[in-house]
Every structure is written in structure tokens, then in C-alpha cells.
Amino acid sequence: MEPKPEQSPHHAYPDHWEADVVLRDGGTARIRPITTDDAERLVSFYEQVSDESKYYRFFAPYPRLSDRDVHRFTHHDYVDRVGLAVTIGGEFIGTVRYDRIDDRGRPASAPADEAEVAFLVQDAHQGRGVASALLEHIAAVARERGIRRFAAEVLPANNKMIKVFRDAGYTQRRSFEDGSVHLTLDLEPTEESLAVQRGREQRAEARSVQRLLAPGSVAVIGAGRTPGGVGRTVLRNLLAAGYTGRAYAVNRAFDEGLATLDGVPAHRSLGEIDEQVDLAVIAVPAHQVPEAVADCGEHGVQGLVVVSAGYAERGADGRELQRELVRQARSYGMRIIGPNAFGIINTAGNVRLNASLAPESPARGRIGLFTQSGAIGIALLSGLHRRGAGLSSFISAGNRADVSGNDFLQYSFEDSDTDVALLYLESLGNPRKFTRLARRTAAVKPVVVVKGARHSGTNPPGHAVPVSRIPDATVSALMRQAGVIRVDTVTEMVDAGILLAGQPLPSGPRVAILGNSESLGLLTYDACLAEGLRPRPPIDLTTAASPQDFRDALAEALADATCDAVIVTAIPWVGEDGEAETGDGQVLAAALHTAVAGGSAKPVAVVHVEIGGLAEALAAASSTAAPRQRPTTARTAPPEAPTDREVPTDRTTDTDRTTATDRTASTDREVPTDRTTDTDRTTDTDRTTASAPAAPPPPAAPAAPEATPPAPEDRPRPGRIPAY
């Protein structure tokens, strides 16, 4: 347990300095001020430090701390003398302290604005970014207390510590005196130091999500012997997906003689498992979760998916349970997806993880999906599956007590298997950070967002984050400036995801429209104008146009340097006998694919009415097309991509909506967050048969990426044409 803070005779315990941090390898830890109650922890910590690290700290052999040392290192006034510790499981793994000094290096008080700083990290935790995190936090504390410079003495052989100071990004001076390196750091933040902090944050948070999505072993806690339970369902879905790692079933109610369940080892507790467990899926009643979390922490589990309900969605008592759940998990260095989560999926061939309640694992694809609602997650998975689209990863975070959409953006920025990031968000816990991360991610791959609870002004049950008071129009403007594609409905998100995952991004706003229906072409033209695109006058092929005419017209449009994208509109054509034909979708699909076979770098979308089999034929061709070639690393993108797109302040509610070519289609309705039966249904008052949802026009490249469009060799192979 953490010590109870005491009051200093000089200054109250600064509880606002406490913070949970994500380390370089994705694990979590807590940083807090050291108190007088930490004497035993400090001694135990020091005993686990190697003689070499002790020598680097004190410049001499120093096998143990004296009573005087312990008193000095645990008694602080939190103004002139401050000590911080990094803890995991309540125990120290690293410490830092500063002492205010005058210009002669003697102990001093304000207005002296320089302090001597010293670090010590357990050898087992060196290389995890502990010292860098401590430096970032102790620098913030020092600035709060009026300190402007740090002085440090480092032995020349202590390369790790020298590197920590050098890489921090602060303005610094270095000299060599009396056999040691003397460093002076100006603590005023610089562009470089801020970039370093954000880079550390990005890598750590991305790695923490990656550890959850690619575990080498999974234990399902609460998998019962009776089929149909939540835990048993997760276990069976895990096995049905072909998970490549080790799986275990854990339930304290198992008979002692039970050796296996569904073909995997069965245990009554995690302690019975001799091997490392990376991920635990907890599916037990809420009152049993603390015991399960403690078992996971003691066993060294790296992350948790808590599908158990009964937390913040139940009211004030549940919110307190949820806060305690997060505190408990983080004290052991574990991150949480949930509680009340639907689960996670990773379709990578070397993982094949389906630790969720989704009965069928989606096909492998290039779309990453994050949802806060399990019901909306089901609708999105179903919609993508019906359209033949696959996923790279899926996270349904439930109450989103820990892992959030911001973490997913950090992961998506890094993930080479993801070309498009889709997010269904019901609340924005940190809008400023979300905008910053979305801008950076959108600079390297499209980000599509549906924002629920737009007008209610309240968070959904279970989301214990402050209610955002930002008007919805402002949210739209922020997203647009960040390069985010905001859509209104789940159906539009599916449409946009499929289009962006299978097509190159347009290099500009110019759109060519061609088809055999003048009316449908004009509707498409108007829709493009409404979205700020620059459509060319529609090319009317007339109702007598054959599939070959479509092929020739599309090939000509793709070769035209004055357009950046093409929309094909089609209705049943008139045959040689003068009779309208229902249309052979496979014939038209083949003709369109022939047109793009030459290697076009422009996106092509098809809007059709009652042409049987066209959508299926195009989807089948798309499923066999090569994935988009990724740049060697996403980190080559600037950390803060600029945007030059003007956002009209009087049209922010409409500018981010993906507009269907037929504005009466019901897919433009708001999707209720508690219903999944209607989210993907298409009805159309202007059609006798709604064979497919109305199409959004190909979205222009997000604002941030426009300055650096993908090179032709980085674009997908032609032939991936979506139909709507």
C-alpha cells in the first residue's frame, strides 16, 4: 500500500505532483513525492541496486544507507528539498531529488534559483525510461518552486545518465571538472524539450497498446464450465480465431482434478501457472475483480481486459469502484481496457487474437477500429464484414477508465498494419490532446471519427471524465483543422473506412463524375460542392452506354491530369433490343477494373442503383488486391503537421459530414447509441429498391496530409473499387 501523506512543517504534501506514467516498454508506474513513511521502502530499494549503480550515484563505494542518509532522503520541505519516487506495486524502482543551492553550491532558499539534482534507478528497470520520466516531472516541480536551473555531477563512465540529460532537449552547458562531468540545464521549456516529451509519451503509449494487442499468452479469468457464460464465450472466441500464443482458463470454482477446458490448461488461480502471462481477460462479478487484479499483479501480468460490468455505469458507488480498479492496476504497472469492455481483436497472422465477445473474428485488413460502445462495435464489425472489409485491430473500451481513443491514436500512428483509423467516441476526456494526436496521425494516415452524444451535453453512463462544454460546432472545426474526417453515422464510417483503406488518397479536390444517368450525376455534383470539393461537370454517357463505354470513359478520366478522383454513377442500361436491363454487375465490374489496371493513382468510387451483383463483384476484387504500401516508418511525419485549410465558422456543423449522393437516404440519420438493429439499414424514399447505401464522394485528403501526398509507389494496387 502507498504511504499516507504527512504534513511537512514547511509545506503541505503536494498531492498534485502524483502522476501515473507509461514507461518506454508500455508498462505503467506511479510517480509521487517521497514522505517520511518511506524509510523502509527506501532501504529495500537501495539494497536491490547494484554496486556499480551505487558508485555512479555517490562517486564511491556505498554499500548501504546510514540512518542519517535515510532521514535526509525521506524528509523534505517540498520547496527547497524535494524527492520523488517511481513506484510499481507500492515499491520504489527509481528516485530523484533536488536540493536548492546558491552560486557557491551551498544549501539555500529562495530567491536562489538553482538546484542540484541526482537520480538512482534499480538496475532491473534501467532502460525503461524511468530516469527520463523522473527528469520531466522533477523539472516541472522545480519550475513551480521558482528554480530555473539544475546542476548535476556525473561520472564520465555513466553514459546512461549523461544520455538522459543530453536527450532531454533542455538548453545545457557541460564542463569537465575534478574527474567528473558538470552539467547545467536551463529548465525553461524549449521546442526541442517539448518535442522530446511528446515523443516519449507517443512511443510509450503506443507500446502499451501494442502489448495488449499482441500478447504471447492469455489467461481468461472466469471461464466457467457451463457454456454460454461471458468468460467461456471469450475463451472459445480466442481459440476459434486460431490464437498463436498460449491460452489458459482460470476459475477458482474449478474442481481440483480438472486439467483442461476446451483443450487448454485449466487452473484455479494464476499462481498455479508456471509461465509468464501477458494478458488477462477478467470476466468475474465486480466484487471479485479486486482479488483477480491482485493475482494478476503478483504474477507479473502486463495488461487487463475487464469485461465485467457493475462500475461507473451503476452510479456514484460504481464510479468509486472504477477509480479504485484503475489505481490498483496501475500500482502493479498494468493498463486496463474497460471495465464493461466488449474486448479486443488483432488479426495479424502471427497473433490472431480475438479476446472479445464477437462470435466471429473479422478478416485481416488494413482498418483499425476503436469504439467506446459495445453495441456500436457490433454494428461496425457487422457492417464491415458484410462489405467484405477486414480489420487490423479492434478495441472496444467500454467505460474507458484507462485506455482511451488517445491511446489508440498513438498506436495507430505507429502501426504499420493499419492504413485507416476509425473511432466511435462518446466523450472526449482531453480534447486538446486528442486534437494534437489526431493532427499528427492524420498526417500519415486517414482518421475517421463519429462523435456520439453530440447534443446531450452529458457523458454516457460509465464515462467518468469531465463533461466537455465545447459546442459541437467547435468540435467539428477542431477536427477539421486537425485533418480528421468527421462523419455522422455508423454506415458513413463503414463507407469511409472501406474507401480509404482500399483507395489512394486524392492529391487534390478536383473530382470527375461520369455515368449513364444525368440526374444521378447532377446529384453527385451537388454533393461534392456541398463538401467543399471541386467537381467537373458530369459526363453523361446516356442510358445506352455499355460496360465498354464505362471502361473507356473511366480510363480517359484517370488519364486526365485535371482531376484527382473519379466517381462513376450507374443505373441499369438499355440493351440492344431497347429494353432496360437489370444489369450484370460482374460484367460492369470487370470493365471498370480493366480501366484501372494501368496503374492509376486516383481513387475511384461507384454509385449504382439496382445493378445486381455489382457491389459483390467489386468487393471480391478488392479483397484480393494488395494492401497499401506503407512508408518505412510513420515517425518521419512531423510531430505537429500544419494545416492550411480554412474552416468556415458558420458552417462547422455541416462541413465534416460525408454527403450521400441522394440527400434523402436514411443513412444520414443520427444513430442511437443504444440500438444496433437500425444502424446499417438503408431505406431510400427515392428508390423502389435500395440495393446499396448512397455513396459519399471520395473524401479529399485530410488537411494535414495535403502537403505531403503519398508517392505513387506508396499507393495501393489499382482495382480496389468500392460500390455504394
Where are these regions (language model features)?
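Long, contiguous binding/interaction regions
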Residues: M1-A204, S208-Q210, P215
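Catalytic-core regions of core metabolic enzymes
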Residues: E188-R645, T649-T653, T667, T673, ...
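Periodic short-repeat tracts
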Residues: T659-A660, S666
